[in-house]
Design a protein with these regions (language model features):
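A short gly/proline-enriched turn/hairpin at secondary-structure junctions
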Residues: 186-190, 225-235
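Short, low-complexity N-terminal intrinsically disordered segments enriched in polar/charged residues
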Residues: 177-210, 218
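Short, well-ordered alpha-helical segments enriched in acidic and aromatic residues
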Residues: 210-223, 227
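A beta-strand edge to alpha-helix "cap/lid" segment located at domain peripheries
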Residues: 179-188, 241, 245-320
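Short amphipathic alpha-helical interaction elements located at domain edges
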Residues: 1-187
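Short conserved AdoMet
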Residues: 146, 221, 296
Length: 320
């Protein structure tokens, strides 16, 4: 059987991803608009009590400053309508602008709105607002999962808001500036992963941690693919590099163990489990992650799937 991106997606099929994440997001999208906004607010308040959320970078916030200034000048009724329009994907200028922002810029925008709601600058959720039974069930589902899954759910709820970009004829993606690559010091270099000695995997981890994305993309086959959690594969060097710049800056990968095994036609399957820390939550949240690599006979990365695992015990599951 010939190797393809589609067939590569199924390596290490016993890997148990956190299916509760897309399931909860799907339930969230079925809620009425008012409940969606209230649920985000209640979840934001609860997470703020448990986790230290990093203040968004000032450079990133300059992309939203004009929009935030408009919102600050609005009446409470206008602010409420705008947030409803963002949640429902209404076609209006601010919703179109929002749709062009990268995930991190959208997160920074909602972080600032949350701060302003606490300060009374932006209309708060009405005092005594009661979530519907369905919304309460979704909120409880968010409470029941681990912090890494919680922030993934909340991230995706706001990332999917705004006007549908597929209906925009021409637009430019607005992303934060590419941060300069870091030196890979001896102190921070990953020199070994128990069970895996392949140098390409070590280079992948070290280059990602150092924001050395130009070097990182050279590890991939030209027709290679990368599958982020709960998404379809991204195929081709240019598209993968864009993903690195927009979604992977300042991540900290902490691989713990792995397994390597031959596959047909000279390919090699490698599975690594470990944790990833994000710049938003740092050491407070370590996401439980599996990386499922398929290397081609030239020892290039033909495919890698990144899975948010169902539970910490899955870190020990290296079976196939």
């Amino acid at each position: 059987m010939s190797i393809s991106i589609e067939s590569a997606r199924h390596i290490f099929p016993e890997t148990l991803a956190a299916d509760v994440v897309p399931a909860t997001i799907a339930r969230f999208k079925q809620l009425r608009i008012e409940d969606r906004l209230a649920l985000i607010w209640f979840a934001y308040l609860e997470m703020g009590k448990k986790l230290s959320i990093a203040t968004p970078d000032e450079v990133n916030m300059r992309f939203v400053s004009s929009t935030l200034s408009q919102i600050e000048r609005m009446s409470f009724a206008e602010q409420e309508q705008l947030m409803c329009d963002l949640a429902s994907g209404t076609d209006r200028p601010i919703c179109r602008i929002y749709a062009t922002w990268s995930a991190n810029i959208k997160l920074g925008f909602w972080f600032q709105l949350g701060k302003w709601m606490e300060a009374g600058i932006v209309t708060p959720i009405p005092q005594g607002y009661e979530l519907s039974a369905n919304a309460l069930a979704v909120l409880q589902a968010i409470r029941d999962v681990d912090p890494g899954q919680q922030i993934t759910i909340l991230r995706n709820t706001v990332v999917d808001m705004g006007f549908d970009t597929s209906q925009l004829e021409n637009y430019s993606r607005v992303a934060e500036p590419v941060v300069p690559p870091k030196e890979i010091s001896d102190k921070n270099r990953i020199t070994a992963i128990p069970g895996v000695e392949n140098p390409i995997i070590l280079e992948y981890m070290n280059n990602m941690n150092a924001n050395q994305f130009d070097a990182l993309i050279q590890l991939f086959a030209p027709d290679g693919g990368l599958q982020p959690p709960f998404q379809r594969p991204i195929v081709g060097s240019d598209k993968i590099l864009t993903f690195f710049h927009e979604d992977c800056q300042n991540l900290k990968l902490l691989p713990e163990k792995g397994v390597i095994e031959p596959a047909e036609d000279g390919y090699t399957r490698i599975k690594i489990t470990g944790k990833v820390q994000t710049p938003w939550f740092g050491k407070d949240v370590g996401m439980n992650i599996a990386w499922r690599f398929l290397l081609n006979p030239e020892n290039q990365i033909f495919f890698v799937a990144i899975d948010l695992l169902a539970s910490p015990k899955e870190l020990l599951n290296l079976g196939h």
